[in-house]
C-alpha cells in the first residue's frame, strides 16, 4: 500500500527492509529506499492523489504519488557555491511509564530467573540474585543506562551556475551516524550531477539530464520485532530489579554469554548482541534520467523521458560462539541486484476560453517499464571451527536460495478536465 515515489519524473524503488513475518520478527532495520535521497538536494515535494496521480503515472499511482523535485541551479543567476555542515544529537524522546515498586518475580514472590516484575515490593530487603549473591532489592532505570546519545555528522558542498539558458548543479554530501544503540553506525556518501539547457533561442526545446550516485555502509543495524536479539525489546521488558550494567562484562572465562535467563528460549544479553552478533551491509545505487521537452506554444508541450534506478546490496551476518543460538557460531551472506528502466512520453494541453468561456486541460501519455530483482542468500549454518566465518566452514553443506523476479508493464493513460469561466 505504498505510494509511488517519483524523483524528477522518474519512479524509484522505495523498498522497505525488516518486514515482519507472521511472528512479528522483522530482523535488522534496513531502512527504505527513500532515505537514499539527499535532503539538501530537494527543492520541493508534492503529494498527488486520485485522478491527478493516475493521469500522470497510470495504474502504479493507485496509492498516490510522492513527487520530489531536486535542485537544478536554474533559480540562481551566475555562480553559487554552498557549504553546509551540521551535528545532530538524538536521545530517546518518550519512554513507557514503567512501574518502579515491584521487583523480579510474580504474585509477590521473588524469582531470580523470572522475566516478570511482579515479585515482592522493592524496599531494600536482601535477596539472592541470579549469580547466587545476596543483594538489596532495588529498581533501576535500564533504558537510560543502556542506550547512549546518538550523533549525526553531515558535511556537504554544492555548486550551481546558470548562464545563457544553461543551468548546472553538482553536490557532494557525506553523513556519519552513530545510533543510540551501542556499536551501531551508518555512513553514506551522495553525489549528484545535473544539467539543464535550452537547445534554441526561442526556448522551445529543453533538455534535462541528471545522475545521482549513493554509497551506503551500515554496521550492526538494530534488530526489530519480537526477537531475542532486539535490544529495545529486552531492555524495555527487563525485570525492574535487574541492573543492566551488571552484564557489560558479557562473556565468561570460557567465552560464553553471561545472562540471567536460563530458560529454554531466553532473550540475549544486549551488550553481547552488539559485540558478537554482527551484521554488515553495503549498498551502491545509481539514479539517472534524461528528458527532451518541446513546447511549440504556451499552452501545449510534449515530453520524452528515460530513467533508470539501479542498485546492488551485499550483506552478511556473523554470530560468534558462546551465544544461545549456536555454541560454535553462525554465518550467512547475501546479495541483491535491482534495476528498473522507464521510458515515457507525456503530452499536455491547457487552454482557457478555448470556445467562448469553455476551456480545458488534457493529458495523454504512455510508459514502458522494465524491472528485474535478483536475490541470493547463503548460509553455512552452525560453524565447524568456531568463529571462522566462511561458507565452507559449516558442520553441514551450505544452503543457498535464489530468487529472480522480472516485470514488464506497458501503459497508456490520460485525462480530460473542462472548465467554464463564469
Stretches with model-predicted labels:
Residues 39-82, 152-154, 175:
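A beta-strand signature from Gram-negative outer-membrane beta-barrel systems
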Residues 22-25, 288-294, 308-310:
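Alpha-helical support elements that line or immediately flank enzyme active sites
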Residues 2, 7, 75-138, 180-184, ...:
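Surface-exposed loop/interface segments of Gram-negative outer-membrane beta-barrel transport/assembly proteins
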Residues 96, 145-149, 159-163, 251:
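Outer-membrane beta-barrel initiation region
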Residues 10-49:
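Short acidic/polar hinge/loop motifs at secondary-structure boundaries
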Amino acid at each position: 500500500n505504498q505510494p509511488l515515489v517519483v524523483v524528477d519524473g522518474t519512479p524509484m524503488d522505495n523498498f522497505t527492509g525488516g518486514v515482519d513475518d507472521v511472528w512479528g520478527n522483522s530482523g535488522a532495520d534496513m531502512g527504505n529506499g527513500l532515505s537514499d535521497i539527499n535532503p539538501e538536494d530537494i527543492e520541493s515535494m508534492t503529494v498527488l492523489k486520485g485522478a491527478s496521480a493516475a493521469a500522470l503515472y497510470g495504474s502504479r499511482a493507485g496509492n498516490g504519488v510522492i513527487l520530489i523535485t531536486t535542485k537544478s541551479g536554474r533559480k540562481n543567476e551566475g555562480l553559487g557555491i554552498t557549504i553546509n555542515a551540521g551535528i545532530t544529537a538524538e536521545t530517546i524522546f518518550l519512554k513507557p511509564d514503567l512501574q518502579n515498586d515491584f521487583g523480579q518475580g510474580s504474585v509477590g514472590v521473588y524469582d531470580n530467573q523470572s522475566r516478570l516484575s511482579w515479585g515482592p515490593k522493592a524496599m531494600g530487603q536482601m535477596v539472592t540474585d541470579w549469580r547466587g549473591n545476596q543483594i538489596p532489592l532495588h529498581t533501576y532505570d535500564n533504558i537510560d543506562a543502556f542506550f547512549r546519545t546518538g550523533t549525526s555528522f553531515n558535511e556537504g558542498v554544492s555548486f550551481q551556475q546558470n548562464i545563457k539558458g544553461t543551468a548546472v548543479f553538482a553536490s557532494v554530501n557525506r553523513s556519519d551516524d552513530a545510533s543510540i544503540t551501542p556499536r551501531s553506525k551508518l555512513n553514506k556518501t551522495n553525489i549528484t550531477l545535473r544539467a539543464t539547457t535550452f537547445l534554441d533561442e526561442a526556448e522551445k526545446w529543453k533538455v534535462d539530464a541528471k545522475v545521482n550516485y549513493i554509497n551506503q555502509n551500515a554496521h550492526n543495524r538494530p534488530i526489530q520485532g519480537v526477537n531475542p536479539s532486539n535490544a529495545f525489546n529486552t531492555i524495555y521488558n527487563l525485570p525492574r530489579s535487574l541492573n543492566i550494567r551488571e552484564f557489560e562484562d558479557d562473556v565468561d572465562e570460557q567465552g560464553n554469554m553471561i545472562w540471567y535467563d536460563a530458560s529454554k528460549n531466553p532473550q540475549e544479553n544486549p551488550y553481547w548482541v552488539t559485540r558478537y552478533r554482527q551484521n554488515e551491509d553495503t549498498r551502491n545505487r545509481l539514479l539517472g534520467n534524461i528528458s527532451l521537452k518541446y513546447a511549440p506554444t504556451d499552452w501545449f508541450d510534449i515530453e520524452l523521458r528515460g530513467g533508470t534506478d539501479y542498485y546492488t546490496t551485499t550483506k552478511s551476518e556473523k554470530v560468534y560462539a558462546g551465544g544461545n543460538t549456536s555454541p560454535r557460531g553462525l554465518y550467512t551472506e547475501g546479495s541483491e541486484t535491482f534495476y528498473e528502466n522507464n521510458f515515457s512520453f507525456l503530452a499536455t494541453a491547457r487552454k482557457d476560453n478555448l470556445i467562448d468561456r469553455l476551456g480545458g486541460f488534457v493529458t495523454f501519455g504512455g510508459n514502458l517499464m522494465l524491472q528485474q530483482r535478483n536475490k541470493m542468500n547463503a548460509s553455512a549454518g552452525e560453524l565447524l571451527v568456531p568463529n571462522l566465518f566462511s561458507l565452507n566452514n559449516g558442520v553441514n553443506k551450505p544452503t543457498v536460495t535464489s530468487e529472480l523476479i522480472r516485470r514488464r508493464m506497458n501503459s497508456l493513460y490520460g485525462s480530460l478536465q473542462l472548465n467554464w469561466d463564469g
